[in-house]
Swiss-Prot record:
Name of one Pfam family that matches: SoxD
Compartment(s) where it occurs, according to its Swiss-Prot or TrEMBL record: Cytoplasm
Known catalytic reactions: sarcosine + (6S)-5,6,7,8-tetrahydrofolate + O2 = (6R)-5,10-methylene-5,6,7,8-tetrahydrofolate + glycine + H2O2; sarcosine + O2 + H2O = formaldehyde + glycine + H2O2
Quaternary structure and interacting proteins, as annotated: Heterotetramer composed of subunits alpha (SoxA), beta (SoxB), gamma (SoxG) and delta (SoxD).
Similarity-based family: Belongs to the SoxD family.
GO molecular function: metal ion binding; sarcosine oxidase activity
A GO term from the CC aspect: cytoplasm
EC number: 1.5.3.24
Gene that encodes it: soxD
Organism: Arthrobacter sp
Protein name per Swiss-Prot or TrEMBL: Sarcosine oxidase subunit delta
UniProt keyword annotations, A-Z: Cytoplasm, Metal-binding, Oxidoreductase, Zinc
Length: 98
């Protein structure tokens, strides 16, 4: 079992949360003007880097609010959580990522 820190409710079991994709991706100003290729790129083409990644999560089994998290994709460790609409926090990674 892993605990995820909800910025509204505190630490909760991972089974209460649902993943929502990459965070800080700008929604197209007018999606109706996009070609199918452009729309599919917006929907499906995301970075898949190893290391710290900004993600969207929803506390579906609790407050039902969306929030963002910085998670290490190599270790699955959550490094920071912050409310939707807040800027991405800076992480102090001097001396390693742990």
């Amino acid at each position: 079992m892993m605990l995820i820190e909800c910025p509204n409710c505190g630490p909760r079991n991972e089974t209460e949360f649902s993943y929502g994709g990459q965070a800080h991706v700008a929604y197209p100003e007018d999606p109706n003007t996009l070609s199918d290729k452009e729309w599919s790129r917006y929907l499906f083409y995301r970075g898949n880097s190893k290391g710290i990644f900004a993600e969207r999560w929803v506390h579906s089994g609790g407050c039902r609010k969306w929030f963002n998290a910085l998670r290490d994709t190599a270790t699955y460790e959550f490094k920071a959580v912050y409310r939707a609409g807040e800027p991405r926090p800076e992480l102090n990674t001097q001396g390693g990522s742990r």
